[in-house]
């Protein structure tokens, strides 16, 4: 790999580490270099260090994980990252039409799974008007609950298996 590609790969890994761990880029770079650019190894080292209550490992800064279920994200850092995203997106939008579609649903997106159209009743109500009948001609597969269950006697097989265990 060329030197530029190697530098780019390292920079991407540093950015991913900052996002995953919520720490400063210089600390991410130090940990990644110490782990010979093994992302998981460096991440493990970071979280093990941050769980040690003493500050003797890093007396200048104690960088704890900020985006875990137990701790809220570090809002100044998050806001700074969002402002960087906004400026980079505005640059991309002028040259790349695909960037403007990034937040749009894909072309095969089916809005019926989330809500019913205003002129039709929801599918789960019994048909009470002719407009509901029109929905059945779209030939969308009807949702099956639970997922992956087949209408061919799945519950009976499960009951037979449970009866056999008793």
UniProtKB/Swiss-Prot annotation:
Gene3D superfamilies assigned: DNA helicase RuvA subunit, C-terminal domain
Cysteines engaged in disulfide bonds, as pairs: none
Transmembrane segments: none
CDD domains (UniProt xref): UBA_F100B_like (cd14343)
Pfam families in the cross-refs: UBA_8
Coiled coil: none
Family named by the database record: Belongs to the UBALD family.
Protein name as annotated: UBA-like domain-containing protein 2
Organism from which the protein derives: Xenopus tropicalis (Western clawed frog)
